Amino acid sequence: MDSLTFTTHCLSFDEVIELPHFEKKSFRVNKKIFATLNIQKKQATFKLSAIHQSVFCDFDPNSIKPATGAWGKQGWTIFDLTKLTDEMLIDALTLSYCNVAPKRLSEKYKA
């Protein structure tokens, strides 16, 4: 998935704003980051539950891994945008949004 497509998907969720976050783009709902995009490294980072993080990392440990240190223990998970299907990235993005967004916003995206 290219960076423009990723950004478009992030901004398609309700009440999302894009702001810089150090050398990355961040996508926020209710002032909380649910995803970041590192354009240079072609990586996205998502805020997942521990269970979802484990499932994704087990699926493809070469392309999906917990962030280092305490961030990874909090569910932040790094995805290689060049090696994964759009469908998988959109699934992770949706889970991340629902993990961070208030219930009134996230309910419509839950399966």
Give a label for each model feature.
Residues 1-111:
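Charge-dense, helix-prone N-terminal extensions
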